[in-house]
């Protein structure tokens, strides 16, 4: 708080969580009663509050409150009008059938509906252990609890299936945001870049985690930016190919076998957690908290560390890496793509109009006029594939990606500008937190 110059008492008010609470409930399953415990934490500096719901056997109240604070600052940083919240249910979803999970999810949602942050004041989404299926169940329960509020009840949940009011591009949004974050930082001449390079072409990239975020980030960076993803690490080991991994083939192998190990297109190293220590230009920890810590930070051989997971670099590791000249893009910024597209989904649900519906054909006709005029002026016909791409009016996913890129680029500019104005901040993480907290303080 020393860089902020806030009025007396305001820092304490910002730190406080408005509504941390515990829910306990029972569900009759398998001929007996099972008891469950969950938590929800709400920070109401701005409404509605946005917070994803995770199902994890190691969840606890302290983690939920910390993640709610992180969501508050993340929304503030990217200028999304949400307060922060978080929810968790202490459960291993793999131990229950889909039918049992539905009963549990609906009861959990009913308990949350009894609380003061119900319905239009909240916006939940998916996280670890939850997905489109669970979000559809939750939305249905919110609607049952608020039968007269059919206009806004669908907007209380994001990450829904497209058929239930979801939005194109939500599944890829965090990984896509990682790509835009890297592009934005490299494009900025105030950053060191990658040995002077301002793009990812040929850049060796190591990614820890091959779930939703890691997969999409790897795919987009390799297919669209020509990066070489040389190492992919998971819990049971890592795979490596100095020429670059085939991401789609590796994903299909993981789906078939349940592991990335044994992939034909790479060398597999089982049981070794040193994948993140392999030499590379870009290191993307996209799996777990505290993946880079004081004991292994000295062995990192990356020029740029991109925090796609929440809290993957500890405080001590951060200091070690920066003392060695490593640039770190902070999680508060890098993984904000998910909440940005969740905001787009909520807007879509509130307006009940898909993005692009009102202008797609008008834009298509305008592009057709331009293409025809150019062909007449030059006397040459455009190649069919180029013409078709140019004439495309813009599907919903194109508009979602465009909006996300704009948010990530403008947010990076805010962070870099603040670093330039206040060099004493020292690093991009501190600059991001200062920019975010100032915005919260102004609300």
Curated annotation (Swiss-Prot):
Keywords, sorted A to Z: NADP, Oxidoreductase, Plasmid
InterPro entries: Aminoacid_DH-like_N_sf, Glu/Leu/Phe/Val/Trp_DH, Glu/Leu/Phe/Val/Trp_DH_C, Glu/Leu/Phe/Val/Trp_DH_dimer, Glu_DH, NAD(P)-bd_dom_sf, NAD_bind_Glu_DH
Record's catalysed reaction(s): L-glutamate + NAD(+) + H2O = 2-oxoglutarate + NH4(+) + NADH + H(+); L-glutamate + NADP(+) + H2O = 2-oxoglutarate + NH4(+) + NADPH + H(+)
Record SUPFAM superfamilies: Aminoacid dehydrogenase-like, N-terminal domain, NAD(P)-binding Rossmann-fold domains
Any matching Pfam family: ELFV_dehydrog
Catalytic residues, chain numbering: 86
Swiss-Prot/TrEMBL GO biological process terms: glutamate catabolic process
Keyword check for NADP: yes
Enzyme Commission number(s): 1.4.1.3
The keyword NADP belongs to this UniProt entry's keyword annotation: yes
Disulfide bonds: none
GO molecular function: glutamate dehydrogenase (NAD+) activity; glutamate dehydrogenase (NADP+) activity
Family statement: Belongs to the Glu/Leu/Phe/Val dehydrogenases family.
Protein name: Probable glutamate dehydrogenase
């Amino acid at each position: 708080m020393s860089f902020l110059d806030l009025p007396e008492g305001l820092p304490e008010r910002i730190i406080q969580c408005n509504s941390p609470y515990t829910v306990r409930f029972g569900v009759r399953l398998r001929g007996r009663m099972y008891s469950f415990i969950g938590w929800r934490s709400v920070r109401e500096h701005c409404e509605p509050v946005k917070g994803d719901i995770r199902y994890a056997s190691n969840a606890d109240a302290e983690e939920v409150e910390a993640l709610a604070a992180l969501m508050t600052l993340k929304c503030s940083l990217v200028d999304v009008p949400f307060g922060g919240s978080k929810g968790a249910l202490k459960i291993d979803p793999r131990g229950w059938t889909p039918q049992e999970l539905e009963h549990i999810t609906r009861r959990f949602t009913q308990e949350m509906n009894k609380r003061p942050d119900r319905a239009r004041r909240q916006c939940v989404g998916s996280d670890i252990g939850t997905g489109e299926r669970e979000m559809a169940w939750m939305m249905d329960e919110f609607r049952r609890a608020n039968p007269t509020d059919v206009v806004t009840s669908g907007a209380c949940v994001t990450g829904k299936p497209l058929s239930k009011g979801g939005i194109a591009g939500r599944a890829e949004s965090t990984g896509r945001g990682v790509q835009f974050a890297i592009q934005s930082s490299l494009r900025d001449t105030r950053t060191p870049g990658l040995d002077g390079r301002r793009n990812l072409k040929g850049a060796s990239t190591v990614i820890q985690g091959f779930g939703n975020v890691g997969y999409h980030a790897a795919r987009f960076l390799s297919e669209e930016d020509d990066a070489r993803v040389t190492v992919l690490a998971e819990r049971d080991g890592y795979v490596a190919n100095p020429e670059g991994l085939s991401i789609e083939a590796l994903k299909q192998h993981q789906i078939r076998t349940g592991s990335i190990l044994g992939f034909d297109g790479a060398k597999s190293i089982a049981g070794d957690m040193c994948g993140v220590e392999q030499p590379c230009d870009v290191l993307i920890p996209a799996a777990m908290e505290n993946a880079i810590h004081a004991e292994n930070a000295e062995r990192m051989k990356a020029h740029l560390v991109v925090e796609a997971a929440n809290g993957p670099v500890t405080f001590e590791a951060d200091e070690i890496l920066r003392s060695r000249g490593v640039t770190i893009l902070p999680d508060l910024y890098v993984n904000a793509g998910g909440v940005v597209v969740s905001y787009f989904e909520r807007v879509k649900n509130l307006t009940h109009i898909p993005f692009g519906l009102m202008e797609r054909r008008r834009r298509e006709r305008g592009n057709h006029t331009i293409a025809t005029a150019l062909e007449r002026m030059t006397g040459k016909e455009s190649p069919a594939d180029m013409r078709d791409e140019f004439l495309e009016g813009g599907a919903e996913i194109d508009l979602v990606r465009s909006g996300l890129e704009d948010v990530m680029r403008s947010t990076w500019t805010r962070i870099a500008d603040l670093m330039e104005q206040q060099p004493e901040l020292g690093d991009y993480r501190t600059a991001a937190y200062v920019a975010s907290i100032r915005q919260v303080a102004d609300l």
